[in-house]
Amino acid sequence: MLGITVLAALLACASSCGVPSFPPNLSARVVGGEDARPHSWPWQISLQYLKNDTWRHTCGGTLIASNFVLTAAHCISNTRTYRVAVGKNNLEVEDEEGSLFVGVDTIHVHKRWNALLLRNDIALIKLAEHVELSDTIQVACLPEKDSLLPKDYPCYVTGWGRLWTNGPIADKLQQGLQPVVDHATCSRIDWWGFRVKKTMVCAGGDGVISACNGDSGGPLNCQLENGSWEVFGIVSFGSRRGCNTRKKPVVYTRVSAYIDWINEKMQL
């Protein structure tokens, strides 16, 4: 009975996922870009850690249920205390209307996470409490298991990462168009070569628009034909030469390769 109840809850969540009350402006960019429309990506969260009595943004993440957040494994440290900010647009405004801060109950890092090779770069955070969904706080859809997107499929990366290489962290949420790069192209020797595996997805690489430091863990948002948005990727790594290096697209953990793992951890 418990399993049926959990499944019913997940299905109910899925039926109302990925539809923001405030549709995004789809012409903006991240590095070298513009601010996102406030609350147009209401599943975007800020993962924050405590240092010297101050909460600091470290990574992005995606709300996929009222008490679960997807992020990257490389964002997690066993020595840090975390909280999750939901419903945020401007990180400089502590008491921003429609936002709240939630403690962390449990963090599941993929047991095969490899920090050297950056493989299985995925973590699931269980929040200390359920958050009430609203116009500013909503959940993203999960992609269908093992699904792939075609070359040049238009997706958007979002986050509060650096505005340019070695630049300042953004106060307001940023967004940027990141067309999908097919695996055959991204794994070419003059692109990412053998470092890119089929459990990853590449997007961008035009040398102009890109994710950057601080965007890690955040979503690659891709819109379905029915208008809803799914988190198809999790920001994993980019080029050391800079945040918007040509032929070095941002590499994302491909969420559709981990659906079974996500479902397993959500039912613990």
Swiss-Prot record:
Effect of G217S: In PCTT; reduced protein secretion; impaired catalytic activity
Any Pfam family: Trypsin
The organism's place on the tree of life at top rank: Eukaryota
SMART domains reported in the protein's UniProt record: Tryp_SPc
Result for mutant: M200V: Found in a patient with chronic pancreatitis; uncertain significance
Function description: Regulates activation and degradation of trypsinogens and procarboxypeptidases by targeting specific cleavage sites within their zymogen precursors. Has chymotrypsin-type protease activity and hypocalcemic activity.
Protein name: Chymotrypsin-C
Upper classification of the organism: Eukaryota, Metazoa, Chordata, Craniata, Vertebrata
